[in-house]
């Protein structure tokens, strides 16, 4: 299907639709429904600006319901610069988003339509997204997320991150969460409750331009492995209590 190496390297945009019809100009189409009964269809069309590239469409009547295991969904889509969810991608049953966008070429992503209330695993969700400059989270629910390892690892184009929507009470691993985000200058962790985090190893390692992180009153490192937490970073202070 569209996860074949050829398409993963040549798809430039992804759009979710609320119907499962395939247009006549589709180069190739696939039944990507779990039961293989045609409920979810994916197809590619040559891109208007570059006919050697493709636009991917994924559709189902009333929108696509994501599989509970949505790991690697767009992993390695090295040419994808845009993903249009259009409120047609229901993530309410998803439990793992492990490496969901890893190595994708997206520059911006809007996750305001995502329902992540059941997700427990966001390990390397955006890992190695070197072109990613902006993430819009909205009311992003992380209250059940246990694993945030490498979530933003090697996101070298990110300059700011506002994670004030994050609830981290159940999170145990933040290892390498921001590791090698070399252009990150500002990160807001005001909502982070880290009392159950057991590892923060390499959390900010290699953040060579990050000087200040802002945390709230529920930030603590007392239960965590903090080896190399700030190794190679520019962090000069952890600012507590300026969370408004």
Give, region by region, the residue ranges found by the protein language model.
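Negatively charged
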Residues: 1-244
């Amino acid at each position: 299907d569209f996860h074949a190496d050829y398409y993963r390297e040549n798809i430039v945009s992804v759009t979710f639709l609320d119907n499962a019809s395939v247009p006549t100009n589709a180069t190739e189409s696939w039944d990507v429904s779990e039961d293989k009964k045609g409920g979810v269809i994916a197809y590619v069309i040559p891109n208007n600006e570059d006919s050697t590239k493709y636009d991917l469409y994924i559709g189902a009547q009333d929108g696509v319901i994501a599989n509970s295991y949505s790991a690697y969904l767009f992993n390695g889509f090295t040419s994808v610069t845009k993903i249009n969810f259009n409120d047609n991608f229901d993530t309410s049953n998803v439990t793992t988003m492990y490496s969901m966008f890893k190595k994708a070429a997206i520059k911006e992503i809007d996750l305001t339509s995502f329902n992540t209330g059941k997700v427990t695993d966001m390990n390397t969700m955006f890992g190695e997204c070197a072109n990613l400059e902006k993430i819009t989270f909205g009311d992003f629910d992380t209250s059940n997320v246990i694993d945030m390892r490498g979530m933003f690892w090697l996101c070298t184009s990110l300059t700011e991150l506002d994670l004030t929507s994050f609830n981290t009470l159940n999170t145990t691993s933040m290892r390498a969460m921001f590791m090698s985000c070399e252009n990150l200058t500002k990160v807001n962790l005001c909502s982070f409750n880290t009392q159950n985090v057991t590892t923060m190893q390499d959390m900010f390692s290699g953040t060579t331009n990050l000087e200040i992180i802002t945390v709230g009153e529920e930030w603590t490192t007392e239960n965590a492995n903090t080896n190399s937490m700030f190794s190679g970073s520019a962090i000069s202070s952890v600012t507590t209590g300026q969370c408004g």
